[in-house]
Curated annotation (Swiss-Prot):
InterPro entries: RuBisCO, RuBisCo_large_chain_AS, RuBisCO_lsu_C, RuBisCO_lsu_C_sf, RuBisCO_lsu_fd_N, RuBisCO_lsu_N_sf, RuBisCO_lsuI
Organism: Arabidopsis thaliana
Single GO cellular component term: cytosolic ribosome
Positions of Mg(2+) binding: 201, 203-204
Protein name: Ribulose bisphosphate carboxylase large chain
Pfam families: RuBisCO_large, RuBisCO_large_N
Sites of N-acetylproline modification: 3
Gene behind the chain: rbcL
Keywords: Acetylation, Calvin cycle, Carbon dioxide fixation, Chloroplast, Disulfide bond, Lyase, Magnesium, Metal-binding, Monooxygenase, Oxidoreductase, Phosphoprotein, Photorespiration, Photosynthesis, Plastid
Extra information: The basic functional RuBisCO is composed of a large chain homodimer in a 'head-to-tail' conformation. In form I RuBisCO this homodimer is arranged in a barrel-like tetramer with the small subunits forming a tetrameric 'cap' on each end of the 'barrel'.
EC number: 4.1.1.39
């Protein structure tokens, strides 16, 4: 026996493979206020007990590996290991379980969503003993939340900057999303803002392509903003997409936007990455820019019910990393979104304290300890007939964003914007008078059509348009 082997044996090391549950399944564990808590939907391979599967998730996302290693004796696993502390069956699913895992705070770098996700949603998602794995929710403890700046400004500061209160904000994504020249693009921006919108938006895949370089687009959009502000007396903005191939280029574009004096820039936070997003968020706070966040690529991660990560986790991560707006689905439009689940993560974006509520998919009580809130953006396949439902679902602290529902108006862009603004003002007035938007919504829109030919024309064009498809990612227990 070699001296090294003797040394290892003398400290209790025993080579080999042992079941994860012997170390990482601890049902007697009482969670701490400083723990990060995770709820995983686990689908074990046939023959793998749920306790072993849950323990494997805790191990492989924290200190464990597939075999015993002698260096375990050089640290305190009891202090640093993740622990699967509870497992429950999923209603209606014989092969799925919810495994609750607690992670000690010391496992994570302060102020880094990147580091947190590298552990919690890292290699463990490819683990062979699991047929599928999905992260349903995270509880971020105040001790960790306080290491983040969060949104650059938040809801109240944005309203003060824009001087707009008592209603949702109105936006429009410029279409076609690709192919316009910078000058024609700026013209569309001007017409929409002059017609009554608060914001217009770059589409998520507009960066700096041969048909429209970013600097030209920024200049023509700034001209459109200032001209429309002068004519309407309202503060206007356009989400200038600063997303780029490098962080340095991204910041350069944000700097140019600041020099132009525009109020807001934009970032694709999933394709751009959390490190880039946090850097841009810090720049925006330091320089008075609002930050609009697009979630391109989210459905690759969150749409399937048994594998990936629910959007509520991505929404929490964005609130930590930083953004003043984020796209959140519409419930009624063309994109996936269950109503109760959407309302759940909308509250997680906006509110300071959110109670556990499994009926809305919220697994943990979340205390944001005064971290600024994020405005949810409803966008994707919506038009004037949707306005009552959108106003009722999302409330005042939201952005209702119409692309084709503005630019597809038969009379042009400005009349499309007028139609949207009239519909919104009618819904807000009716709500303030005590009318039920869910019941009387269509009648409210028809009444407003009498005073707005632009709205009447829009209602005629889109009266038959619906997107009635079943939701893929329903809450457990729903048919």
């Amino acid at each position: 026996m070699s001296p090294q082997t003797e040394t290892k044996a003398s400290v209790g090391f025993k080579a080999g493979v042992k079941e994860y549950k012997l170390t990482y399944y601890t049902p007697e564990y009482e969670t701490k206020d400083t723990d990060i808590l995770a709820a995983f939907r686990v689908t074990p391979q046939p023959g793998v007990p749920p306790e072993e599967a849950g323990a494997a998730v805790a191990a492989e996302s924290s200190t464990g590996t597939w075999t015993t290693v002698w260096t375990d004796g050089l640290t305190s696993l009891d202090r640093y290991k993740g622990r699967c502390y509870h497992i429950e069956p999923v209603p209606g699913e014989e092969t799925q379980f919810i495994a609750y895992v607690a992670y000690p705070l010391d496992l994570f770098e302060e102020g880094s969503v990147t580091n947190m996700f590298t552990s919690i949603v890292g290699n463990v998602f490819g683990f062979k003993a699991l047929a599928a794995l999905r992260l349903e929710d995270l509880r971020i403890p105040p001790a960790y939340t306080k290491t983040f700046q969060g949104p650059p400004h938040g809801i109240q500061v944005e309203r003060d900057k824009l001087n707009k209160y008592g209603r949702p904000l109105l936006g429009c994504t410029i279409k076609p999303k690709l192919g316009l020249s910078a000058k024609n693009y700026g013209r569309a921006v001007y017409e929409c803002l002059r017609g009554g919108l608060d914001f217009t938006k770059d589409d998520e895949n507009v960066n700096s392509q041969p048909f429209m370089r970013w600097r030209d687009r920024f200049l023509f959009c700034a001209e459109a903003i200032y001209k429309s502000q002068a004519e309407t007396g309202e503060i206007k903005g356009h989400y200038l997409n600063a997303t780029a191939g490098t962080c340095e280029e991204m910041i350069k574009r944000a700097v140019f936007a600041r020099e132009l004096g525009v109020p807001i820039v934009m970032h694709d936070y999933l394709t751009g990455g959390f490190t880039a997003n946090t850097s841009l968020s810090h720049y925006c706070r330091d320089n008075g820019l609002l930050l609009h966040i697009h979630r391109a690529m989210h459905a690759v991660i969150d749409r399937q019910k048994n594998h990936g990560m629910h959007f509520r986790v991505l929404a929490k991560a964005l609130r930590l990393s930083g953004g003043d707006h984020i796209h959140a689905g519409t419930v009624v439009g063309k994109l996936e979104g269950d109503r109760e689940s959407t309302l759940g993560f909308v509250d997680l974006l906006r509110d300071d304290y959110v109670e556990k509520d499994r009926s809305r998919g919220i697994f943990f009580t979340q205390d944001w300890v005064s971290l600024p809130g994020v405005l949810p953006v409803a966008s994707g396949g919506i038009h004037v007939w949707h306005m009552p439902a959108l106003t009722e679902i999302f409330g005042d602290d939201s952005v209702l964003q119409f692309g084709g529902g503005t630019l597809g108006h038969p009379w042009g862009n400005a009349p499309g914007a007028v139609a949207n603004r009239v519909a919104l003002e009618a819904c807000v007035q009716a709500r303030n008078e005590g009318r039920d938007l869910a019941v009387e919504g269509n009648e409210i829109i028809r009444e407003a059509c009498k005073w707005s030919p632009e709205l009447a024309a829009a209602c005629e064009v889109w009266k038959e348009i619906t997107f009635n498809f079943p939701t893929i990612d329903k809450l457990d227990g729903q048919e």
